[in-house]
């Protein structure tokens, strides 16, 4: 597994570097320049299946993202920034990372890795920028937990997830406060679903519906930004993330909504992160 992650990371970095280097003379290189970035986060996760926590204790999440970040002046104004970050991530959410006396339940441990993309528009003043964003990712996740005190119903509910890597998706809303050139902090909230089984056709169609909605929202907010770019940056943030939150609420009971399917294992996580851009 470690070899797979290392190989995956190497190919990702190589592809981005190749893109930056292999440019034609007709392309504005600075427009497409992406800078390497490292993001480190800590958060608190609540676990549930169909709204039931199945007696799983809350987990402290530690996460690292390696990626490439692009910030360029948008066509909507000199102080409006178009922000995008493509990344690989590795995370561990464990009850051992959140050792408190008021955290009852079954001890658990989760490892997850995957790829993601975050984007948004922000406002820049000198070296300080406010960059609200939305993010989507695909992940492979393994959950293990202590069955010593688990009931038969709890064991049955978690049987499809225990000890195996499962595919899943997530959405994240956050605000990137760039304090100075190359350093920023982000408060953020993530909903991450882990699927007990893969149903490619239903998953594909559910994702097509989800991203079609995002495409329409992007078109709508672009019209707002033509007239009021600062307000449009935050309208884009609110609409995209409100839409994703609603869509994931519909998926809480059916992982491939609107198609009949079972409930996913869900992580709801509040996080605080910091990013170094080189």
Describe each PLM feature range.
Residues 180-278:
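Predominantly the C-terminal beta-signal and adjacent terminal strand-loop region
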Residues 21-81, 85, 91-97, 250-278:
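Short glycine/proline- and aromatic-enriched beta-strand/turn motifs that initiate or cap beta-hairpins
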Residues 48-56, 92-104, 143-156, 197-204:
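Outer-membrane beta-barrel translocator domains and adjoining extracellular loop/strand segments
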Residues 77-150:
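Gram-negative (and chloroplast) outer-membrane scaffold detector with strong preference
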Residues 72-77, 127, 177-185:
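Repeated loop/turn-to-beta-strand initiation elements of outer-membrane beta-barrel proteins
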Residues 40-42, 62-72, 111-123, 136-138, ...:
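Residues on the lipid-exposed face of transmembrane beta-strands in outer-membrane beta-barrel proteins
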Residues 1-33, 224, 278:
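Cleavable N-terminal export/targeting peptides
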């Amino acid at each position: 597994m470690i070899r797979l992650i290392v190989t995956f990371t190497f190919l990702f970095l190589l592809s981005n570097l190749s893109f930056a280097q292999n440019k034609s003379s007709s392309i504005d290189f600075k427009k497409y320049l992406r800078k390497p970035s490292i993001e480190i986060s800590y958060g608190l996760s609540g676990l549930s299946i169909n709204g039931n926590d199945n007696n799983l204790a809350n987990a402290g999440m530690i996460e690292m993202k390696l990626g490439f970040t692009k910030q360029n002046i948008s066509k909507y104004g000199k102080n409006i920034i178009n922000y995008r970050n493509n990344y690989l991530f590795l995370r561990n959410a464990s009850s051992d990372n959140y050792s408190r006396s008021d955290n009852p339940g079954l001890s658990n441990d989760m490892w997850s890795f995957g790829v993601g993309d975050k984007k948004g528009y922000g406002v820049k003043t000198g070296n300080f920028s406010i960059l609200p964003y939305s993010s989507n990712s695909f992940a492979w996740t393994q959950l293990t937990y202590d069955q010593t005190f688990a009931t038969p119903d709890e064991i049955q509910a978690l049987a499809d997830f225990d000890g195996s890597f499962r595919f899943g998706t997530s959405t994240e809303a956050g605000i990137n406060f760039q304090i100075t050139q190359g350093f920023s902090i982000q408060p953020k909230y993530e909903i991450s679903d882990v699927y007990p089984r893969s149903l490619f056709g239903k998953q594909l169609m559910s994702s097509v519906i989800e991203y079609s909605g995002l495409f329409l929202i992007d078109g709508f907010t672009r019209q707002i930004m033509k007239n009021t770019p600062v307000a449009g940056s935050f309208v884009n943030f609110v609409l995209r993330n409100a839409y994703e939150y609603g869509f994931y609420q519909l998926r809480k009971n059916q992982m491939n909504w609107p198609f009949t399917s079972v409930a996913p294992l869900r992580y709801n996580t509040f996080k605080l992160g910091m990013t170094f851009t080189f």
